[in-house]
From Swiss-Prot:
Role summary: Regulatory subunit of the poly(A)-nuclease (PAN) deadenylation complex, one of two cytoplasmic mRNA deadenylases involved in general and miRNA-mediated mRNA turnover. PAN specifically shortens poly(A) tails of RNA and the activity is stimulated by poly(A)-binding protein (PABP). PAN deadenylation is followed by rapid degradation of the shortened mRNA tails by the CCR4-NOT complex.
Domains as described in the record: The N-terminal zinc finger binds to poly(A) RNA. Contains a pseudokinase domain. The protein kinase domain is predicted to be catalytically inactive because some of the residues important for catalytic activity are substituted and it lacks the equivalent of the binding site for a peptide substrate. However, it has retained an ATP-binding site and ATP-binding is required for mRNA degradation, stimulating the activity of the PAN2 nuclease in vitro.
Name this protein carries in UniProt: PAN2-PAN3 deadenylation complex subunit PAN3
Low complexity bias locations: 168-191
Name of the encoding gene: PAN3
Main location: cytoplasm
Subunit text: Homodimer. Forms a heterotrimer with a catalytic subunit PAN2 to form the poly(A)-nuclease (PAN) deadenylation complex. Interacts (via PAM-2 motif) with poly(A)-binding protein (via PABC domain), conferring substrate specificity of the enzyme complex. Interacts with the GW182 family protein gw. Interacts with Gyf.
Region Disordered, annotated ranges: 166-191, 235-259
Annotated GO MF terms: ATP binding; poly(A) binding
GO CC terms in record: cytoplasm; P-body; PAN complex
InterPro entries xrefs: DUF4797 (IPR032050), Kinase-like_dom_sf (IPR011009), PAN3 (IPR030844), Pan3_PK (IPR041332)
Region (Knob domain) location: 695-790
One record GO biological process: positive regulation of cytoplasmic mRNA processing body assembly
Length: 790
């Protein structure tokens, strides 16, 4: 049987194109290898074309290794082409259509237009009937650019110049002629035209228009200086280790994998110089086409009528053109908000945020020791809650209007495992269940400045009749009283004789340096006012009243202010004989506004005694001297009880300060979202480390004690040493976060960049690509998963 092969040769207008390097007789392949035998067959085109010196010549171990260019941490030069993830923890990402090209935006150094034109010319030539023995002719004009790269300047079809020769052999037995599978590009050249190198070596140049090189211009190459993907920390990070400069990365079409997971039976595999080559055998006519070292489904609807080398259309959505899942670096709008500290901030959250989160986690996980448990004598379980932990000393008075002591606990729900705050009212017996109407109204109220009520029940688990109210738990919170009205510790043994309740209000010299600290900035006071009025507005619009608006029942979590202990007064002061429980709600709402004015005045003076009846006028005069007129008018309006007031009337008094508060909140959201994206990448790298450490140094697998030291696993072991155990020239450990993160990202992306791995005895040196390492990692971990499932 004879096969029809199309022989395509380009005639360069520049004599430099005839350099012998383009016609290497051995191509860096040993003559005794099967690959050399295959390429020397008469029915295979002679290797020629641009890019050969960038391919097989790289197998020479004597060639110098270029230093890496500066790369942004967590922003490697290779952008993976996989989009989305499945619920499976170790499941790979899916591919998305990307542009197939190499470093020159084309195929084997040609531009996209030239590649498409060459493919069209070959397709037209292939359409000539097999009975015609004359060769069709076409002219492809290629010129050399200033930098030595070939660019397509013109594509001319003429009948006189036979620059492109298509040799066709007529089969001796037409009735036995085999049907060749159509190529991806629409031409008639079989997939058996050239071997394919998985590590980035170019395929047979004779099939250049039909078999794309596995190298493409990445979106990060040549990008603008102000693009979103640019990281400001790129200038601070040097090269991440030895190795050649990263060549462009190949983009794969939809439905294709950058690493062949299942090769046709007629495709031969050979490892030459650390590079795995795949090429079809003689009976590969009906096999599945192999393009760009990947198995392409010819029946995929995305490939019908689409050329494999066609450029990306301008109509393709941006989400389809850039599908990388590697952290692109911080946003330009949050760079100025991030702390200028160590380089580690490029990988991890700031120390201040980490300390705050860790402190909250530590508070949430506190447990009592034996002495504390004996002192409090808490029950093991209360209704549906267990693991009670006291948040304040026991038997603290709840409020001046209430005579029942109260205690606050943190508890864990038995079913969900969530932590809640339990407020226990000691010795309270519920007289009527009519108050549950108000409880249901409070449970429906949801606001960011109000601690939400979840549940109310009575219990005897504490040894008495107790009322328990269940609220959301906000760890690390403190009351407004503890934050702004707690006396500061005295230094050098000095004690102010006029402090606390014993200090007369006429002691003017101490008003500027109160025992509770210096006066608060006006911006802080307005921030508290806006949050309190927002929560109070939600309460009043729900037809309820707070009733306990004082510093002991307002909590502060970071910079968030919330109303707490809501609904307690509605239960403890409920009149079962009243026909309408909401009849007096308007009066209580007016009391809330007066209490808000007293609280703001106390904050401005930083003293609780400033709101006493005899001291109010002097305190307002002090506010006039130290703060703006708007704050004074705000307080005076709340103290005026002659007219009916509304919380809505307070909004114009706040004025444009609301926009300042909104801008601060949005800036904080931007920074937190950027930190979240950073930590999400850390989780992705963690999954790669889990796979590596599950394979490396495994003592036994299926009764094979040497499983982790042989085969593909040996390369993973050497890669582990290259990743974590590198040393400097003088033998000192080389600890570089950028090196570790960058290599893990390249491994996850399946980069075609090659890395030099050396054994610990320095007797073995392997040069492999990250794509091969990823293939080894996936195969080895799949073996572990299969064995664990069985």
């Amino acid at each position: 049987m004879c096969s029809t092969y199309g022989l395509l040769s380009f005639e360069f207008s520049d004599t430099a194109a005839m350099d012998p390097i383009f016609f290497s007789p051995t191509n860096g392949i040993p003559s005794e290898s099967k690959l050399a035998t295959y390429m020397n067959r008469q029915n295979v085109a002679t290797p020629s074309g641009y890019g050969l010196n960038n391919g097989f010549s790289l197998l020479n171990l004597d060639s110098p290794l270029n230093k890496k260019s500066q790369v942004t941490p967590q922003s490697p030069e290779f952008i993976p082409t996989r989009l989305g993830s499945t619920p499976n923890f170790y499941a790979p990402y899916h591919n998305a259509p990307m542009q197939l090209s190499n470093g020159l935006n084309g195929v084997n150094g040609l531009t996209a237009a030239a590649a498409a034109a060459a493919a069209a010319a070959a397709a037209a030539a292939a359409a000539v009937p097999s009975s015609t023995s004359s060769a069709s002719s076409a002219s492809v004009t290629i010129s050399k650019t200033a930098n030595g790269g070939a660019s397509m300047l013109a594509l001319q079809k003429t009948a006189s110049i036979a620059s492109v020769t298509i040799a066709q052999q007529q089969p001796q037995h037409p009735q036995k002629q085999q049907q060749h599978p159509p190529s991806v590009g629409g031409g008639a050249v079989s997939a058996a035209s050239a071997p394919i190198a998985i590590s980035g070596a170019p395929p047979n140049p004779a099939a250049a228009p039909f078999v794309s090189s596995m190298s493409a211009q990445t979106p990060l190459k040549g990008r603008g200086a102000m693009m979103r993907q640019e990281s400001p920390t790129a200038a601070m990070i040097s090269g991440a280790g030895p190795g050649e400069k990263s060549p462009p990365h190949g983009m794969t079409p939809h439905g294709a994998s950058p690493i062949p997971s299942a090769l046709p039976t007629s495709v031969h595999q050979e490892n030459v110089g650390g590079t795995i080559y795949f090429y079809p055998t003689a009976n590969a006519q009906n096999s599945q086409p192999v393009v760009n070292s990947m198995v392409v489904d010819g029946t995929h609807p995305a490939l019908h009528g689409v050329s494999a080398v066609a450029p990306m259309s301008a109509g393709v959505p941006a989400a389809m053109m850039y599908t990388g899942h590697v952290y692109p670096g911080p946003s330009s709008n949050v760079v100025t908000m991030q702390p200028k500290t160590l380089l580690e901030s490029a990988f991890f959250m700031p120390d201040e945020m980490r300390a705050e989160v860790l402190a909250r986690n530590e508070i949430s996980n506190l447990i009592m020791d034996a002495a504390e448990a004996a002192q409090h004598a808490l029950p093991l379980e209360v209704e549906n809650y267990h693991a009670l932990y006291p948040l304040e000393p026991p038997a603290q008075p709840l409020h001046a209007k209430l005579t029942f002591p109260a205690t606050t606990y943190r508890a864990t729900h038995n079913t969900t495992g969530y932590k809640y705050c339990l407020r226990r009212i000691h010795g309270f017996r519920l007289q009527s269940t009519k108050c549950m109407t108000l409880v249901e109204m409070w449970k429906k109220l949801q606001h960011t400045n109000v601690v939400q009520l979840r549940e109310v029940f009575t219990t005897k688990a504490f040894g008495d009749n107790s009322l328990v109210l269940v609220y959301d738990y906000h760890p690390g919170s403190q009351t407004l009283l503890a934050k702004y009205f707690t006396p500061a510790p005295e230094t050098n043994g000095y004690t102010d004789p006029f402090q606390g309740e014993a200090r007369p209000f006429s002691h003017k010299s101490n008003m500027q340096r109160t025992s509770n600290g210096p006066l608060l900035p006006e911006a802080t006071i307005w921030s508290i006012i806006m949050q309190l009025t927002a929560g109070l507005k939600a309460i009043h619009h729900a037809g309820l009243a707070c009733k306990v608006l004082d510093p002991t029942k307002i909590i502060v979590t970071g910079k968030r202010v919330r109303f707490s202990s809501c609904c307690i007064s509605d239960i403890t002061q409920f009149d079962p004989n009243a026909s309408n429980p909401l009849a007096l709600v308007n009066m209580h709402q007016q009391d809330d506004l007066t209490a808000l004015g007293r609280l703001v005045l106390a904050l401005a003076c930083r003293c609780l005694q400033s709101v006493q009846r005899d001291n109010v006028q002097s305190s307002i005069d002090m506010v006039t001297r130290n703060y703006s007129t708007d704050l004074r008018n705000f307080i005076v309006y709340l103290f005026t009880t002659n007219n009916r007031r509304s919380v809505t009337d307070l909004m114009p008094m706040i004025g444009a300060r609301f926009y300042t508060q909104l801008d601060a909140l949005q800036s904080k959201i931007d920074m937190q979202e950027d930190e979240l994206a950073k930590e999400m990448e850390n989780g992705r790298l963690y999954r790669i480390l889990v796979k590596l450490n599950s394979i490396n140094e495994r003592p036994d697998f299926n009764l094979d004690c040497t499983w982790s030291e042989t085969g593909d696993r040996y390369m993973l072991k050497l890669f582990r040493d290259y990743l974590f155990h590198s040393v400097t020239e003088d033998g000192r450990p080389w600890l570089d976060h950028a090196h570790i993160v960058q290599c893990l990202n390249k491994l996850d992306a399946g980069s075609i960049e090659r890395v030099q791995l050396m054994s610990r005895d320095e007797q073995s040196v392997l040069i492999v690509s990250y794509a091969e390492l990823k293939n080894c990692l996936e195969n080895a971990f799949s073996e572990l998963m299969s064995s664990a499932a069985n």
